[in-house]
From Swiss-Prot:
The lineage of its organism: Eukaryota, Metazoa, Chordata, Craniata, Vertebrata. It catalyses: S-ubiquitinyl-[E2 ubiquitin-conjugating enzyme]-L-cysteine + [acceptor protein]-L-lysine = [E2 ubiquitin-conjugating enzyme]-L-cysteine + N(6)-ubiquitinyl-[acceptor protein]-L-lysine. Residues 223-261 form a coiled coil. The keyword Cell division does not apply. Belongs to the KCMF1 family. Zn(2+) 2 binds at C24, C27, H46, H50. It is found in: Cytoplasm; Late endosome; Lysosome. E3 ubiquitin-protein ligase which accepts ubiquitin from an E2 ubiquitin-conjugating enzyme and then transfers it to targeted substrates, promoting their degradation by the proteasome. Together with UBR4, component of the N-end rule pathway: ubiquitinates proteins bearing specific N-terminal residues that are destabilizing according to the N-end rule, leading to their degradation. Does not ubiquitinate proteins that are acetylated at the N-terminus. Keywords: Coiled coil, Cytoplasm, Endosome, Lysosome, Metal-binding, Transferase, Ubl conjugation pathway, Zinc, Zinc-finger. This is E3 ubiquitin-protein ligase KCMF1.
Length: 381
């Protein structure tokens, strides 16, 4: 209990250091050892103007305040996280905050939660007055008639043992230093260096556990119902989403079918239109070309000249036709004569008599008969 277990100095990075511990009430999870605090260590987020809560180990507290007496209204010395004033008790700190800083909404760390054992050392709140009223009310269950007595009392369950706040194994005590010396008034300190009664501590811990479990059960009730409601809402949303998806799919299928039919009809129409347009364009182009040729070829002339030219063209065409026909007929006749002559030559080569005209044959016969009459008879054999 002579070290701050689990705590390291954010300036020199020394862990589990001894002596006084100074916790910043503005910066989250920022602690300094005594030497760094006195030397004025700062960072980009921490300055020397930030209020600091001094926390002592149990050994240092026994060394400084062993044997002293404390009244009920003087537990410990706390620092105001808004103005940095020190020396307040729980009651006086609550009165000071409600009177001086009621309208302040800056996020600060509770010095009581940071100093008391079992409290949350980094409990940040933006309504410090309400936090003090709810969590750190003045103790009424102590025996006020005893007046001043030796400090051998337990910390109250509402101050950190009970509830959902995390526990710390080491016990810290606060002090306010004036002039280099630390003077402290503690709400929990073993007077005459006596250890805390283990039975009383166990009972207080059990009561805190019961309260925390009861709070958890009470909080779990509405959470379970809320979970059921959320599940029902999720199921309804899923069903609605599925129905919407089915509707969308049916609509998409219908639109796809309609689009397919429309596309086929449009394709046929477009092809027909393109064909007709292409034919029309071709005809127009042909007509335009004819018109252009006629315009270019036809000279400017009178009707008589045109008629004479047309008659000349007709005569020329007839002449050409007759010429072609005559050439074709001559070729056919010449070819037939040549064929006949060839055949006669072939007969002569074969020993056949040449074919001659009728008049020529008659003349030859007459000549032969006359010659026979003039010749002498042949000699007898």
């Amino acid at each position: 209990m002579s070290r701050h277990e689990g705590v390291s100095c954010d300036a020199c990075l020394k862990g589990n250091f001894r002596g006084r511990r100074y916790k910043c009430l503005i910066c989250y999870d920022y602690d300094l050892c005594a030497s760094c605090y006195e030397s004025g260590a700062t960072t980009t987020r921490h300055t020397t103007d930030h209020p600091m809560q001094c926390i002592l180990t149990r050994v240092d507290f026994d060394l400084y305040y062993g044997g002293e007496a404390f009244s009920v209204e003087q537990p410990q010395s706390f620092t105001c996280p808004y103005c940095g004033k020190m020396g307040y008790t729980e009651t006086s700190l609550q009165e000071h905050v409600t009177s001086e800083h009621a309208e302040t909404s800056t996020e600060v760390i509770c010095p009581i939660c940071a100093a008391l054992p079992g409290g949350d050392p980094n409990h940040v709140t933006d309504d410090f007055a309400a936090h003090l009223t709810l969590e750190h009310r003045a103790p009424r269950d102590l025996d006020e008639s005893s007046g001043v007595r030796h400090v051998r009392r337990m910390f109250h369950p509402g101050r950190g043992l009970g509830g959902p706040r995390a526990r710390r194994t080491n016990m810290h005590f606060t002090s306010s230093s004036t002039g280099g010396l630390s003077s402290s008034q503690s709400s929990y300190s073993p007077s005459n260096r006596e250890a805390m009664d283990p039975i009383a501590e166990l009972l207080s811990q059990l009561s805190g556990v019961r309260r925390s479990t009861g709070g958890q059960l009470n909080s779990s009730g509405p959470s379970a119902s809320q979970l059921q409601q959320l599940q029902m809402q999720l199921q309804l949303e899923r069903q609605q989403a599925q129905a919407a998806r089915q509707q969308l799919e049916t609509a998409r299928n219908a639109t796809r079918r309609n689009n397919a039919s429309n596309v086929t009809t449009t394709i046929t129409q477009s092809t027909a239109a393109t064909n007709t347009s292409s034919t029309e364009n071709n005809q127009q182009s042909i007509q335009n070309s004819q018109f252009l040729l006629t315009r270019l070829n036809d000279p400017k002339m009178t009707e008589a000249e045109r008629q004479s030219i047309e008659s000349e063209r007709a005569d020329r065409s007839l002449f050409v036709q007759e010429l072609l026909l005559s050439t074709l007929m001559q070729e056919e006749s010449s070819s037939s004569d040549e064929d006949e002559r060839g055949e006669i030559a072939d007969f002569g080569a074969m020993g056949c008599v040449d074919i001659m005209p009728l008049d020529v044959a008659l003349e030859n016969l007459n000549l032969k008969e006359s010659n026979k009459g003039n010749e002498p008879p042949p000699p007898p054999l």
